[in-house]
Curated annotation (Swiss-Prot):
The keyword Hydrolase applies. This is Antimicrobial ribonuclease. GO terms for biological process: defense response to bacterium; defense response to fungus; killing of cells of another organism. It comes from Pleurotus sajor-caju. Keywords: Antibiotic, Antimicrobial, Fungicide, Hydrolase. Optimum temperature below 60 degrees Celsius. Active from 0 to 100 degrees Celsius.
Length: 10
């Protein structure tokens, strides 16, 4: 995925 959840994982 490349959504908000993916961004938060960084």
């Amino acid at each position: 995925d490349n959504g908000e959840a993916g961004r938060a994982a960084r």
